[in-house]
């Protein structure tokens, strides 16, 4: 992981609140000249990170990938959609140490020693085990496979590790999914396209909050995101204190067209958990746990208004970004604006 590379991963420090990163992934590299050699890392920018590993960029890379005879490297698998950088780093560390991580139960492990489990099947099997762990299984993580051979090995599933249907797996070419500047509209991932989609969602949400005056559809409590007095902060601690006082609670706005019903995120989350959202197929970890676990995070649920299913990972991601959007809008005056701009350069 290169601490200098990012899209927008430092937004947590900008406003003193958690915001889902635009993109963060854990990747698996394979050496082209030595295809039995692998490397595991994490990044918010896969295209640039791969170029660093291959020496195309002066800065970055890693000692192991610089060794003579191993370049070029190819990225063959990427797990992404993590809710934070820290969670991605936990996944990365667990994948690097599958023989001892707490995220894989001892009776389910397929790698038992530090220097074992170095085949492609072991790497993919451990990714499957982590995707099915009680910690990671409800985050809406997604998988990209960039090679037909890797896809074949994934489907063979040599160690018989189940993953749930809510884990989205896609097969594509790395060059088709990531463009050089990450803004190519024709590529699979386009930051500009993502930002435009968010802008449309934020603008429609602004109308709901400021003009429609909708209360929470569950508790019927009025939601007021407009401060009656001028707000000015001198530090991130002031922002944290402001939010802890109950200002600007996290909101959930149904993202289905022609609905846009408003909820407190906490109200909707509790409702989804009470209703239950059974997996269509359980992971091996969940089979072992049986009914002994009460999850704190739902997978999905139905909007009480339009009756369409809402993906919790997608909704919670937009909820953190929505609050950041309104907080910046609220603070975008005078000294407060300068505070945010200066903090962005930290």
UniProtKB/Swiss-Prot annotation:
Its EC number is 3.1.-.-. Its cofactor is a divalent metal cation. InterPro entries: GIY-YIG_endonuc (IPR000305), GIY-YIG_endonuc_sf (IPR035901), Slx1 (IPR027520), SLX1_C (IPR048749), SLX1_endonuclease (IPR050381), Znf_RING/FYVE/PHD (IPR013083). A zinc finger (SLX1-type) spans 216-306. Keywords: DNA damage, DNA recombination, DNA repair, Endonuclease, Hydrolase, Metal-binding, Nuclease, Nucleus, Zinc, Zinc-finger. GO terms for molecular function: 5'-flap endonuclease activity; crossover junction DNA endonuclease activity; zinc ion binding. Residues 22-105 form the GIY-YIG domain. PROSITE patterns: GIY_YIG (PS50164). GO terms for biological process: DNA-templated DNA replication; double-strand break repair via homologous recombination. It is an enzyme of class 3 (hydrolase). GO terms for cellular component: Slx1-Slx4 complex. SUPFAM superfamilies: GIY-YIG endonuclease. PANTHER family: STRUCTURE-SPECIFIC ENDONUCLEASE SUBUNIT SLX1. Belongs to the SLX1 family. HAMAP family: Endonuc_su_Slx1 (MF_03100). Forms a heterodimer with SLX4. Catalytic subunit of the SLX1-SLX4 structure-specific endonuclease that resolves DNA secondary structures generated during DNA repair and recombination. Has endonuclease activity towards branched DNA substrates, introducing single-strand cuts in duplex DNA close to junctions with ss-DNA. This is Structure-specific endonuclease subunit SLX1. The lineage of its organism: Eukaryota, Fungi, Dikarya, Ascomycota, Saccharomycotina.
């Amino acid at each position: 992981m290169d601490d200098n590379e990012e899209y927008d991963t430092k937004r947590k420090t900008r406003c003193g609140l958690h915001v889902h990163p635009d993109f963060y992934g854990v990747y698996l590299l394979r050496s082209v000249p030595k295809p039995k050699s692998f490397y595991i890392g994490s990044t918010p920018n896969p295209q640039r990170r791969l170029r660093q590993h291959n020496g195309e960029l002066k800065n970055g890379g890693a000692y192991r990938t610089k060794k003579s005879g191993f370049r070029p490297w190819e990225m063959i698998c990427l797990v992404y959609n993590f809710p934070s950088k820290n969670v991605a780093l936990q996944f990365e560390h667990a994948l690097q140490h599958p023989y001892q991580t707490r995220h894989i139960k001892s009776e389910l492990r397929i790698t038992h020693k530090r220097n074992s489990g170095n085949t492609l099947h072991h790497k993919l099997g451990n990714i499957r085990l982590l995707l099915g762990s009680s910690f990671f299984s409800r985050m809406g993580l997604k998988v990209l496979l960039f090679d037909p051979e890797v896809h074949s090995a994934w489907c063979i599933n040599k160690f018989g590790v189940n993953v749930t249907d809510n884990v989205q797996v896609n097969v594509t070419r790395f060059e088709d999914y990531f463009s050089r500047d990450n803004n190519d509209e024709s590529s699979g991932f386009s930051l500009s396209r993502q930002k435009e989609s968010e802008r449309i969602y934020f603008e429609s949400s602004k109308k709901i909050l400021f003009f429609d005056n909708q209360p929470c559809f569950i508790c019927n409590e009025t939601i007021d995101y407009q401060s009656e007095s001028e707000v000015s902060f001198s530090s991130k601690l002031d922002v944290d204190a402001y939010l802890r006082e109950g200002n600007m609670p996290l909101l959930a706005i149904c993202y289905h067209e022609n609905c846009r019903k408003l909820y407190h995120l906490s109200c909707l989350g509790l409702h989804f958990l009470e209703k239950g959202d059974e997996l269509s197929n359980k992971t091996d970890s969940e089979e072992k746990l049986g009914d002994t676990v009460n999850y704190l995070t739902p997978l999905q649920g139905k909007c009480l208004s339009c009756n369409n299913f809402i993906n919790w990972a997608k909704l919670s991601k937009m909820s953190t970004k929505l609050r950041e959007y309104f907080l910046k809008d609220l603070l975008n005056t005078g000294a407060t604006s300068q505070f945010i701009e200066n903090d962005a350069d930290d």
